[in-house]
Regions:
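Basic, glycine/proline-rich low-complexity segments that contact nucleic acids
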Residues: 4, 8-100, 121-200
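Beta-strand/loop nucleic-acid-binding surfaces
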Residues: 112-124
Length: 200
């Protein structure tokens, strides 16, 4: 017996499908909504095959049990630094990444280079992005923390300038800007901790 999608899914919000409680196993169940994503192979140079170690160490002995098998996956190379300053880019597609919980976006920059970035929630194909000191305060733009208004939510934050984003990178995670000092910004982490990071 087939169950229609309308009966199965209660609602779709925030890229999540919530199932109706048709059985005890379905109650509170939700999965990522992949209907709005682009399918296809990643461009050459932005993908590579990672070797599966199947729970073995360098001596070949099993150190983690029950690992191995599964579907083969291609690793997408993500640009966490986004250091193409003052070069506008256009979002070509928003895609699923099997190695992370967040969706990723393929960006075509004006100089012809393509890169993957982490996709914020409302970023769509065709949107324009920019990394700049003077970037407008819009979704997908990247600018120093000192220019972001207090109370705003940010993601993919650098701990040290130039090292690439390392804070709030997984799906649904964000930090909140609490205060800006001379060279530092106070951020409220996803854990609730308040941390001081460089504002450049």
């Amino acid at each position: 017996m087939e169950i229609s999608a309308e009966r199965l899914y209660g609602n779709k919000s925030n890229n999540m499908k919530k199932y109706k409680p048709t059985s005890p196993g379905r109650r509170q169940m939700s999965v990522s909504d992949l209907s709005g994503l682009t399918k296809g192979n990643p461009p050459r140079g932005l993908r590579k095959r990672l070797k599966s170690h199947a729970g073995r160490n360098s001596q070949g002995r099993i150190t983690v049990r029950h690992q191995g098998g599964g579907k083969k996956r291609l690793f997408r190379v993500i640009d966490f630094k986004q250091n193409k300053l003052n070069i506008p880019g256009r979002i070509e597609s928003v895609e699923y990444d099997p190695y992370r919980t967040a969706f990723i976006a393929l960006v075509l920059y004006k100089d012809g280079e393509r890169r993957y970035i982490l996709a914020p929630e409302e970023l769509k194909a065709g949107a324009e992005i920019l990394t700049s000191e003077d970037a407008p305060f819009e979704i997908g733009m990247r600018t120093p923390l000192r220019r972001i208004p207090v109370g705003s939510f940010v993601y993919n934050i650098e701990m040290f300038p130039g090292r690439g984003g390392s804070i709030a990178r997984s799906a649904g995670n964000f930090a909140q800007v609490l205060a800006n000092e001379k060279n530092h910004t106070h951020l409220k982490m996803p854990s609730g901790e308040v941390r001081k990071v460089f504002s450049e």
